[in-house]
Amino acid sequence: MAYTKLIVAAAALAAMGSVSAADESAALPPAFVWKPVPGLVWKTVGSARIENGLLIAELDKVGDAYAQAEIDLSAYDRKPYEIAATVRAENIVDARQAYLGYRFAVNYLDMSMGGNRTWPSGRRIVGDYGPGETHFIDRTEKVRRKAFIQVGICSARGRVTCDLSTLRIREAQPLVPKRNVGYKVKYPGRVKNLPRMRGVMLGNVKGDAWDNLQAWGANLVRYQFAILGTGPVTNFEAYAEGFRANTMKELDNITATLDAAKAHGMMVVLDAHYACGGSCSKELGDPIDWSGDWRVFHDKRFAKLFAWSWQKIAERCKGRTDVVYGYDLMNEAHHTSPAAEGCDLVGLQEKIARAIRMIDPDTPIIVESMYCDPGWFRSLSAIGLDNVIYQVHLYYPHDYTHQGILTSASDVYCWPDPKMGWDKDFLLKSLKPVIDFQKEHEAKMFVGEFSAIAWAPNAEGYIRDCIRIFEELGWDWTYHAYREFPGWSVEHEATSRGKGTENFRPSKDNPRKRVLLSGLRGELAPGGVTGKGRGR
């Protein structure tokens, strides 16, 4: 009887996830047609078991139960790929982190990043799903070796079944069509002739913050602001009403920031740090393939509302090019599923930029790649407008910069690390897609964020190497962050590894602070230019 149930369950799962290979083959280039993944040797972890090709992972207490197999991804070197299978998830609960719980994902050694193991996040599922098709999509362009696929439950409880015979793979289709190839960005003399801009990222700082930054030698700040709606996003009108009201309130904060910066000889990047409508999730009724994507890329109502808020900011800031460095449209924006028509990463940024230009034709617009990640510059398109600055964030290697935050506090990574291949040259190679983009489009580049957590061994050396590279490349930059989380603050030292405030103490002088101040004064530029951060 149990055997019969398993066969019926497997057949039901396969039927639910079936695709018409003939139809797909006729409609798609060969690279984008699904292919089977033969020869996988599965090993089970915990109580997971495989019976007649059906994986069964079931836990009534939080734990691990999954199957794992090594998978050869060499055919997808520097290409995005996706893997699919037919699964059913039931009552997945008690996952402590978004990346835990239901597991359908791949991890691998990233040979393009020194060989460190990388764990791209799969789709998050809580509660019930299916039976139906599930996807893991890795849209990065990396060299992947020693890859393992995992299916089941990780640090949660519930039940997952997967028909392993339905597992298939293909090259992932481009999310954002390439456009404006070879477009050369032009800049007015006012922007081209700015001195090298160096500074920090901050929020609504108070007290002696501005005097302090001026004494440090900063001439640029990246001001992060958050405009949110009220009520659930599922009630758009209520959310939009609150969002509009909060936009009008934020205008006064922006004005105060610009006035303070001008009084202290600085310029301001206006950074819309959080997305209108937040992120999509299954719990909010969104399709599971949208999970984690910014809502503005899938729902045109929120995209239009976001553009409206930027127009209001432009109305307030028009004519202040002496203090506004640029309108930073999005912060680490991303979507891993196809966007609504005209609302993909590049398309939406261009629409917002054009909406701003109707009001303020003079202030630079700041545009970014997916996640603001260097690797995504390989597929980034210029938006076809002049006076646009392109932004990148640098947290490579992430295992080093964020050790103890997204990884165990006991995992210690060093800088440099010859065994891992991590050094200044590694950082420069990581930025090659950005450098290539800059050359193709003759674009002005801005590094909006870079840092290393306070307890990282030789964090000051990492910060020094970053700044020297930016200076050699002629890029403006802002350090993450000023008077925010103590772990990034150079006015604090870590007494132990941990995110709690008890793990830090105030510090008037420390190696990280000395390096940052040296950078702000221009002393890390080629030739060691000095003088209030205004050196070229």
Protein language model regions, located:
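Bacterial N-terminal signal peptides that target proteins for export
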Residues: 1-7
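Bacterial N-terminal signal peptides
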Residues: 7-15
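Extracellular and organelle-lumenal recognition/adhesion modules and their flexible linkers in secreted
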Residues: 14-16, 22-184
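Short beta-strand segments enriched in hydrophobic/aromatic residues
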Residues: 85-89, 106-108, 140, 153-155, ...
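Aromatic-rich peripheral "rim/lid" segments of glycoside hydrolase catalytic domains that contact
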Residues: 177-182, 457-536
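Active-site mouth of glycoside hydrolases
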Residues: 182-364, 369-377, 387, 486, ...
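Short low-complexity, flexible loop/linker segments enriched in glycine and/or proline
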Residues: 236-239, 283-287, 381, 461-463, ...
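Extracellular glycoside hydrolase catalytic/binding regions
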Residues: 308-311, 315-325, 332-475, 495-506
